[in-house]
Amino acid sequence: PDTGEIAFYDFYGGNLAGIREKFSYLKELGVTAIYLNPIFESCTNHRYSTADYHRVDPFLGTNEEFAAFCRAAKDEGLAVILDGVFSHTGADSIYFNRFGHYDSVGAYQSKESPYYSWYRFKEYPNDYESWWGVMDLPNVEETEPSYMDFVIHNDDSVLRYWMRQGISGWRLDVVDELPAAFLRDFYKTLKEENPEAVLIGEVWEDASNKISYGEQREYLCGYELDSAMNYALRTIAVDFIMGRKEGRRMLAEMTHLIENYPPEHFYAMLNLIGSHDIERILTVLAKDADTNTLSAEDIAKKRLHLLLAWQMTMPGAPCIYYGDEAGVTGGKDPDNRRTYPWGHEDEEILSWTKELTGLRRRSDALRTGRFIPLYADGDVFAYARSIEGGRDIFGQKKEDGFFIIAMNKNTTSLRTVSVYTNGLAYGELTNALYPRMKPIRTINSRFTLTLPPLSAVILKGQETRKKRAGVLLHPTSLPSAGGNGDLGPNAYRFIDFLKTAGQSLWQILPLTPPLMGDSPYLARSAFAGN
């Protein structure tokens, strides 16, 4: 019968050498880090059923080739993040060895096995706890001392071994199933190996309020995770673009999320719109489409344009699931793991993605600038990203910049909105990606914008006016040998003094001849000098 299990054993030849050959493509796409799904030896193609934590799957390469892969990636400015699966192993593994494929004495084979204490047997050997009832994935007792030593503490632990091969961090699978004691030890040891290494958790909800198995988790308290997969923000964005939520409700949910997260975490969240665990985003966006004017495929692509503009201009680290940038479609696992369509990419989506990643890479404000909601009502959402005074949200020296991102999710109707920027914008706003387009003029910090159906625009503002200080003083009040000040040497010395004092403005009274009451405001001529 067609149980679907055969899908776990299909292999298409991808390996580390193939990824390395595509480093130039990844660089062109604007990628700075590669997050790899599990690479350790396993009998399945997804490799979440680990057989040997210390060995690269031979289908992918060797340990030596992986170390060379990391060195080459570093030379190209690419960090490597590994997927760590530590809540369960494979049944077909060195440690459990249910099928006797390994020379080791596995926990399934003998209670005398050095790995027996790692597992939770109900009735030995065939009845044991497994991940969500999948018998090929026996659960482990994560806080069992020998298991923690094996994964974390030993000099050749799984964590330390792969860090020393050159990786820059880990993404932890099903982190809510890892006990706090395990997670905190993992985090502490990771930072001992490399203080700059990153630890990312798979979290599907608000990571600041996660309750797992009755326990309030402390992911964002500084000793468990640096970041989490931002499925929560993805849900908010997709629901809005799909028309399931209107602007005000969407912004309320987003604001709630932002307020819950410390800035250090919100600006480090892994902002994804696709992953190996969910339907391909282009397939999702083709649903609930009004096909009276456009095909479902065209609507999906336009919706993706909006979502990509959002992803690449929000605080956080945008993460591209391979193939999403090329228009790959697919249903639920494993259909969402199709091969990359080399030579058959959707050039429109790929070009838009590259334009957005390039803009983000060039703009400090889009990475660590303030996030400022401007308008959220009905079908339209607009927000700003801003750095002023040469300092970003964390007080780090960055280049000033100001952007406004606006989008209309309606599939058939344009929307014209008046957006008030509360003093943020003045002068003209130009299109950040297409600067030859007609600029939009702001009046009293407000501008009017017409957005076609299913469209997004990124506007670049002039540098924010810097706050300045100065003095109000008429030249005649300056000290001078004759008693009355003038615009001679004393005035020049006064200008030097103002500069030294950090002042940048000198406002003077009119220089026209005084008339009635010795007032220069009542001069005979505005063009006469005194």
What are these regions (language model features)?
Residues 26, 36, 53, 73, ...:
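Conserved, mostly hydrophobic/aromatic
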Residues 2-17, 49-63, 134-150, 167-177, ...:
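The substrate-binding groove and active-site-proximal loops of carbohydrate-active enzymes
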Residues 70-79, 87-88, 93-104, 158, ...:
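Active-site-proximal helices and loops of the catalytic beta/alpha 8
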Residues 34-44, 84-93, 173-179, 202-207, ...:
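Short, solvent-exposed turn/loop segments enriched in Gly/Ser/Thr/Pro and often Arg
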